[in-house]
């Protein structure tokens, strides 16, 4: 789409702890997906980049400079913690990836559940003062995942790179007191995979090596329906072994690690974590809600985020929830094949609705009421 054709088209940006998804409203997929990472030179000397001297690199740029740079993640556990770094990521998103003139487009940003008020106000102020967007909106990621699944009531299990949230939603509004979260997600699974591969004398310690392990995790891992039975099957010589070609050409044989890694979500104690499992988290969230909405929540468990993409995860969660739920309760887990982009797609759909046109926070609203307007309009 040319800039002319795209004039006034809303921009949708889903800022995740590990990955940014960005694109134009009305599209089915984000046109730009890159790591939420800022790479800064380890020494004070500025690195010469393709576009002249640069004091930092963002997204895919940082891959080429990995050895001489320190990596930082501006978003920690779903929350923006480093605003300078975040602005570098937004610069890269708008000008390098989407190549837009920001004053010509509304922008919809996503946020984690229970995002602090100050964070929302900062996002609002930066979009208007630094980028001159004509209008903006902020929506909770889990609500957008629910819209993406064609529902307004349900419970979203959203697991990305840095955090796993379970968010119950009734008629489009989150139920804040029942939101659950654990700091156990994709990055932790990658680290755990490094540990269990180390037991077999494979050592993955550098950033580049961890990227390899992440790729192994995403391509070969799956969730066992019954963990103990799967271990027994492996011990009896079951056909579980797969081979992965390492960057240096050596083959890596992997068998039980394929299901041991994602089992961490269902048995956190395996990796030495004292936190709730993903199914206990979901059950506790539902049981904290009013009795009259629980039935709708059990019947609409929506998976969202890249860490829910393991084959077998939806089936295992269904089995665990069926065991925990009252016997007569109908349990349904909805696992869309492209759920890693569910949040972005929900934003793309919302921003395109004609009924949404009056919901935007405009530059005029901001001039009159200041950044606190975001709490009145983005609810």
Curated annotation (Swiss-Prot):
Its EC number is 3.6.4.-. GO terms for molecular function: ATP binding; hydrolase activity. Gene3D superfamilies: 3.30.420.40, Actin, Chain A, domain 4. It is an enzyme of class 3 (hydrolase). InterPro entries: Actin, Actin/actin-like_CS, Actin_CS, ATPase_NBD. It comes from the Eukaryota. Keywords: ATP-binding, Cytoplasm, Cytoskeleton, Hydrolase, Nucleotide-binding. Pfam families: Actin. The keyword Nucleotide-binding applies. It catalyses: ATP + H2O = ADP + phosphate + H(+). It is found in: Cytoplasm, Cytoskeleton. Its main location: cytoplasm. Actins are highly conserved proteins that are involved in various types of cell motility and are ubiquitously expressed in all eukaryotic cells. Belongs to the actin family. This is Actin, cytoplasmic. It comes from Euplotes crassus.
């Amino acid at each position: 789409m040319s800039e002319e054709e795209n004039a006034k088209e809303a921009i949708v940006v889903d800022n995740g702890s590990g990955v940014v998804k960005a694109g134009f409203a009305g599209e089915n997929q984000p046109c730009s997906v890159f790591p939420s990472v800022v790479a800064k030179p380890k020494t004070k000397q500025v690195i010469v980049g393709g576009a002249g001297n640069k004091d930092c690199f963002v997204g895919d740029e940082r891959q080429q400079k990995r050895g001489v740079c320190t990596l930082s993640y501006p978003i920690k556990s779903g929350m923006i913690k480093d605003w300078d770094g975040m602005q570098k990521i937004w610069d890269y998103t708008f000008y390098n990836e989407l190549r837009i003139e920001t004053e010509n487009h509304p922008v919809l940003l996503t946020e984690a559940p229970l995002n602090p008020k100050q964070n929302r106000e900062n996002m609002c102020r930066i979009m208007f003062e630094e980028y001159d967007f004509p209008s903006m909106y902020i929506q909770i990621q889990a609500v957008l995942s629910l819209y993406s699944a064609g529902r307004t009531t349900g419970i979203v299990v959203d697991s990305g790179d840095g955090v796993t949230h379970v968010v119950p939603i009734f008629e489009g509004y989150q139920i804040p007191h029942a939101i659950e979260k654990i700091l156990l997600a994709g990055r932790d699974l990658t680290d755990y995979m490094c540990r269990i591969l180390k037991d077999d004398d494979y050592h993955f310690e550098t950033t580049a090596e961890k990227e390899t392990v992440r790729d192994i995790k995403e391509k070969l891992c799956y969730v066992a329906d019954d963990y103990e039975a799967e271990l027994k099957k492996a011990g009896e010589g079951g056909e579980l072994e797969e081979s992965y070609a390492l960057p240096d050409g050596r083959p890596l044989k992997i068998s039980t690690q394929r299901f041991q890694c994602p089992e961490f979500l269902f048995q956190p104690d395996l990796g030495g974590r004292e936190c709730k499992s993903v199914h206990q988290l979901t059950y506790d969230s539902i049981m904290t809600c009013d009795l009259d909405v629980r039935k709708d929540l059990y019947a609409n468990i929506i998976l969202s985020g890249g860490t829910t993409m393991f084959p077998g995860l939806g089936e295992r969660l269904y089995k665990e929830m069926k065991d925990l739920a009252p016997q007569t309760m109908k349990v349904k887990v909805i696992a869309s094949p492209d759920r890693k982009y569910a949040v972005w797609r929900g934003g793309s759909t919302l921003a395109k609705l004609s009924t949404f046109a009056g919901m935007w926070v405009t530059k005029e609203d901001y001039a009159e009421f200041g950044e606190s307007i975001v709490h009145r309009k983005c609810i």
